[in-house]
């Protein structure tokens, strides 16, 4: 059996009930985002990052296509700008960008961290049992 050394779960835990992001942001992502709703920003700066493809991300993509300087997009991609959206105004289309993985489309509800971990463990145990019974 091949195994992973680790997994990146930031997108999943972003949509946990314990995450301090505004509930409206988490609910929007859970109900509206699909795996096709991502784009890669900052490629022209050798810092490729997958983001939720909304209005601000599209502005950044357009500016990058015009060979902009980082200063031209800094305000859009700054963590402080995203914090305003996450914790103050919830304006997904007009404030900052959201770093997510393509798995965003597989998440359709906000649940507790405990439920996320239990679900992963259950899936792991089922996989191990499946391997054991196939030998």
How should these model regions be labeled?
Residues 1-135:
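Conserved active-site-proximal phosphate/metal-binding subdomains
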């Amino acid at each position: 059996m091949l195994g992973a050394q680790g997994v990146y779960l930031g997108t999943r835990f972003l949509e946990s009930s314990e995450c301090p992001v505004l509930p409206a942001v988490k609910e929007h992502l859970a109900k509206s985002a699909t795996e096709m709703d991502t784009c890669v920003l900052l490629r022209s700066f050798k810092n490729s990052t997958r983001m939720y493809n909304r209005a601000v991300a599209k502005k950044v993509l357009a500016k990058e296509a015009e060979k902009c300087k980082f200063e031209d997009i800094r305000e859009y991609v700054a963590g402080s700008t995203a914090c305003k959206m996450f914790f103050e105004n919830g304006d997904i289309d007009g404030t900052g960008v959201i770093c997510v993985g393509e798995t965003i489309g597989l998440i359709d509800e906000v649940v507790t961290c405990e439920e996320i971990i239990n679900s992963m463990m259950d899936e792991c145990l089922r996989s191990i049992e499946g391997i054991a019974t196939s030998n």
